[in-house]
């Protein structure tokens, strides 16, 4: 396995923890850096299908198309699916990159849910993301409500 890069060089990618990154919509030119960071799973929250290059081994791509629209909430089942896949990748020693169009709302919601799956509270997850990614807006009403709803139902999902 190639040696993991020690720092992010792309301004589009923010490292949240040792195992979690958030970015805007990555392009083909970002694939080498994503692989070098040890990313083994990309969770794509954009409604447009991402480049197939993002899913080339050793990386797996999980496309979870969602919309950033206050009247069309992100489905909790979609967030659950992303978290379950992320936890598996993390347990296997890989990192996870979550992206949407701008890396502000949908990716932030999914990343917060991954952190909750790892044991963070909703408040701690949102705070950490805000500290690590300046453009992140987990407090947008339609995003925060999804994070909190996910946190409330997660104990039942993880135990099932």
Residue locations for each model-derived region?
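N-terminal carbohydrate-binding accessory modules
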Residues: 1-2
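Cysteine-based protein phosphatase catalytic domain of the PTP/DSP
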Residues: 5-95, 116-148, 154
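A phosphate-binding catalytic loop at a beta-strand-loop-alpha-helix junction
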Residues: 93-112
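C-terminal domain-closing interface element
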Residues: 152-160
